[in-house]
Amino acid sequence: MSTYAIIKTGGKQVKVEVGQAIYVEKIIPEA
């Protein structure tokens, strides 16, 4: 059994595991 997280960013969901690096789009906050 592996430990993982599901991250929602930029309208996408990404599954990441321990020690894994991901790249996400830069999110510009709305003023």
From Swiss-Prot:
* InterPro entries linked: bL21-like, bL21-like_sf
Q: Which UniProt keywords apply?
A: Ribonucleoprotein, Ribosomal protein, RNA-binding, rRNA-binding
Pfam families (UniProt xref):
Ribosomal_L21p (PF00829)
Any one Gene Ontology MF annotation carried by this entry is: rRNA binding
Q: Any coiled-coil ranges, and where?
A: none
Gene Ontology CC annotations of this record: cytoplasm; ribonucleoprotein complex; ribosome
SUPFAM superfamilies associated with the record: L21p-like (SSF141091)
The reply to whether tRNA-binding figures as a keyword in the UniProt entry is no
Q: Where are the transmembrane segments?
A: none
Q: Tell me, how does this one assemble?
A: Part of the 50S ribosomal subunit. Contacts protein L20.
The family classification in the record reads: Belongs to the bacterial ribosomal protein bL21 family.
Q: What does this protein do?
A: This protein binds to 23S rRNA in the presence of protein L20.
Q: What is this protein called?
A: Large ribosomal subunit protein bL21
Please tell me the species this chain comes from.
Answer: Streptococcus thermophilus
